[in-house]
Every structure is written in C-alpha cells, then in structure tokens.
Curated annotation (Swiss-Prot):
Catalyzes the methylthiolation of an aspartic acid residue of ribosomal protein uS12. It catalyses: L-aspartate(89)-[ribosomal protein uS12]-hydrogen + (sulfur carrier)-SH + AH2 + 2 S-adenosyl-L-methionine = 3-methylsulfanyl-L-aspartate(89)-[ribosomal protein uS12]-hydrogen + (sulfur carrier)-H + 5'-deoxyadenosine + L-methionine + A + S-adenosyl-L-homocysteine + 2 H(+). Its EC number is 2.8.4.4. It comes from Ralstonia pickettii (strain 12J). Residues 9-124 form the MTTase N-terminal domain. [4Fe-4S] cluster 2 binds at residues 155, 159, 162. It is found in: Cytoplasm. GO terms for molecular function: 4 iron, 4 sulfur cluster binding; aspartic acid methylthiotransferase activity; metal ion binding; protein methylthiotransferase activity. GO terms for cellular component: cytosol. This is Ribosomal protein uS12 methylthiotransferase RimO.
Length: 453
C-alpha cells in the first residue's frame, strides 16, 4: 500500500502490475490529492480502497483477485481498476464481479475519469481541495531520483500470446508537448533518470501520422527519434539519464543510435524479441525475423559499441520443437544479449495462442526456460567480467551499513543487475541515494557487479 498523508476523507491504494500500470496509479493518486483526499497507508485507516489490477497472465490475475479479496475483508468498500477490470470469463461475465460481487465499481486500465467518478459516488470529495499541495510533477510511487515517463497507451500489434490490446486498446500517443512538459517537471523536481515506457515505444506517433507539435516555441514532430532527441537534450541540462523501454526492432531505431553514441540518451535498449525461429515468430504473430534482427543488432553496435541490449523471450510456445528452441539458444549466444528474461509459456485466457496445436507439457516448458537461462547467464557473465577494472558512472539507489547499491547505465531498476558499492573509505567520498558516483569495478558474477568509489 502507498503512503502519502495530509487530510481526510481517506482513500487506501493498492498498485499491482507493470510500470505502465504504476503510471496509471500515480495519475489517480495525484488527482485524489488535488481534490483533497488523503491517501491512507492502511486498510483500517481508509474510508474506501482503490485496487489497480494486472490481468496479463494467470499468476497476475490470481494476485489481483487475492488483493481485492484482502481489501474487501479488511475494509469492505473497494473500487477496482486496471487491466483485470477489462477481462471477462468464458461466459462473458466480468471476472472481478463474478469472484467478488461486493466491489463498488470496476473500470478498465487508464481510466482516471471513471475511477474518480466512482470515488465521488461512494466518498464525496472535500469542499476545499488541496491542489497547492500537489507538486507540478504529480505524486510518484518510485524513489525520488527516478520516474517512469509514459509516452503512449495501447498497442496496434496483435501478438497471439497477448491480450493487452483487448484491455488497453489501440495505440494512442500522448501529445509531444505534454510529454516534454512532464519530463521537465520531473527533472526540475530532482529526478535523475527518466524511464521512457509504453506498449510500443518505436510506434510513438504512428496513430497521429507523426503530427508536428511544438515545444518551447520550436516545432517538434510526434515521433520517437525526435522525442528521444528532445528528451536527451533536456535531461542533459540537469545531468540526468534517459532510458528507453519496450522498443521494437524497427528500422527507425537505427536513427536513435547516434544519439546514444553521443551520450544524449543512455546506450540501452529494452527490445522484446520473444523468440528467434521464424516459424515460432509467425505463430506468435510477431514482427521481424532473427536474421534481420541479428544484422540490425550488429549495425547498432558498430555505431554505439557501448550499447546494452535487454530482451525477453518465451520458451515452450505451442508447437515449439527442440530444433526451434535450439535456434533460440544459438541466437542469444550469437547476439550476445546483455540482459535477458525468459518466461515458460503460460496460456492467457482470451489469447489466440490458446487455439494453436502442439501445447507442450509443463515440465518441458520449465526445462527449456531453465536451459535458456543457463545460456543467458553465461553470456551475461562474460560481458560483466569485461567491466572489471573499469570505472562506471553509477546512480545510487540506496545506502546501508554495508555500503551502497546502485545501477550503471546498463541496468534498469528492478529488472536488471545491481552495482554493490563498498563503504566510502574517506569522508569526501560519501554518497547518498540519488547521487551519481564513479565506481571502479572490482568483481562480477552472472548478474551483478561490485566496486568502490
């Protein structure tokens, strides 16, 4: 539960799911505070509870249903929002209300207006709002030194394993000036790292035909390359980082490489490749193919040798043969992907992949995921070992009695590795959370680094 305090009436808040859902939660909490509601850190201290759910995979659905049940048991007045709110069961009934019929209201994701309307219905807003208590950057649920910057909502792809478009809709890009203003407010508030997120960052502006916008009196196209360039220029004025997530490997990404090579944005790409064998990609209804992607990765690294590539994959997709899986293992080794995650395929209710023949047993899916991660860890370990002896710029996330924990440009929060920093040997070398420090790397394993200032 999130804890921000001021005055009553009081709303409890539970936020589940991905960074896109976290941004939705931040927007709702910001509006609640602007209208004078207090955010309670406990169920018992709240007049009602809002639960922002995730509905992407079965485990997330169960976690969300459990959270709703806990909120109902502890408080009794619950409003539900998020991706699970848009899902229905096989009979066409809302999943949430079929399990928890006593919830006050249910909305889908990215539904600020509907959530606030439900709150107003069941907990009238105060007469005197406290909009002056809400900072220009809004209320954030991340640490003060980094923040997620969502540039669009929804997705135009129809991947067979995914139901996100049915929950979040087609691509809707935010106006470029609106994105830039939010970024500026975050940087002015002391944010040291902007994490650009969406369902498909490469497609930013496609829905508005790359419409020309304006920022600070200058024309700025609603397009990934132009937006990233402007964000990098803005962040450099504050000595901050810009990190790109959910970037499809389209040719347009080539245009961003010079910006990374020049240091305007971090040399880091989060590219969700999912597989490498063309037949599996076809069954997944995924764009691109492994050979072209491998050529593109090589070209990117020629322009930006320091580039870190993170990706996610699915092992054990329906119909995946041992030969197809071996192609995937060969690909991650040849591509030398720096950071990877792998999920054993799990059927998602409503996904068209459920109708594909050749479903694999659970033990085969898990065994392939484990084999994948063994190869991936060896690749990662080789790359991290090459960093030993080098000095890296590290953003400190926390400080404790054992020293500090931070991240290099190659590490996004929560999903990548960490840099463990020895306690400062001299007073002038002290650091705190949110500081950038130069760390000499003294050790590495398959995931993390160790070093000293």
């Amino acid at each position: 539960m999130s804890d921000v305090s001021t005055q009553s009436p009081k709303v409890g808040f539970v936020s589940l799911g991905c960074p896109k859902a976290l941004v939705d939660s931040e927007q709702i909490i910001t509006q609640l505070r602007a209208e004078g509601y207090e955010i309670s850190g406990t169920y018992g201290g709240a007049d009602l509870v809002v639960v922002n759910t995730c509905g992407f995979i079965d485990e997330a659905v169960q976690e969300s249903l459990d959270a709703i049940g806990e909120a109902l048991a502890e408080n009794g007045k619950v409003i539900v929002t998020g991706c699970l709110g848009a899902k229905k069961d096989a009979s066409g009934q809302d999943i949430i209300t079929s399990v928890h019929p006593k919830v006050l209201a249910v909305t889908g994701p990215h539904a600020l207006g509907e959530v606030m309307e439900a709150v107003h219905t069941h907990l009238p807003k105060p007469h005197d709002p406290f909009i002056d208590l809400v900072p220009p950057q809004g209320i954030k649920l991340t640490p003060k030194h980094y923040a997620y910057l969502k540039i669009s909502e929804g997705c135009n792809h129809r991947c067979s394993f995914c139901i996100i478009p049915s929950m979040r809709g087609d691509l809707v890009s935010r106006p470029v000036a609106e994105v830039m203003l939010e970024a500026e407010n975050l940087l002015k508030a002391g944010v040291k790292e902007l994490l650009v997120i969406s369902q498909d960052t490469s497609a930013y502006g496609v829905d508005v035909k790359f419409r020309m916008g304006f920022w600070n009196g200058r024309p700025l196209k609603t397009r990934m390359t132009e937006l990233v360039g402007a964000l990098g220029e803005l962040a450099s004025q504050y000595g901050a980082w810009v990190r790109l997530h959910y970037v499809y490997p389209y040719p347009s990404v080539d245009e961003v490489m010079p910006l990374m090579a020049e240091g305007k944005v971090l040399p880091y790409l989060d590219v969700p490749l999912q597989h490498a064998h063309p037949d599996v990609l076809k069954r997944m209804k995924r764009p691109a193919n492994a050979e072209k992607t491998l050529d593109r990765i090589r070209a990117w690294r020629e322009v930006c040798p320091e580039l870190t590539i993170r990706s996610t994959f699915i092992a054990g997709f329906p119909g995946e043969t041992e030969e197809e899986f071996q192609t995937l293992l060969d690909f991650i080794a040849e591509a030398e992907l720096d950071r990877v995650g792998c999920f054993a395929y799990s059927p998602v209710e409503g996904a068209t992949a459920n109708d594909l023949p050749g479903a694999l047993p659970d033990e085969v899916r898990e065994e392939r995921r484990a084999r994948f991660m063994e190869v991936a860890e060896r690749v990662s370990a080789r790359g991290l070992q090459r960093k030993v002896g080098k000095s890296l710029r590290v953003l400190v996330d926390e400080v404790n009695q054992d020293g500090g924990i931070g991240r290099s440009s190659a590490d996004a929060p929560e999903i990548d590795g960490l840099v463990y920093i020895a306690p400062p040997s001299k007073p002038y070398k002290r650091y705190k959370a949110g500081d950038f420090v130069s760390v000499k790397i003294t050790g590495a394993d398959g995931h993390d680094l160790w070093g000293e200032v």
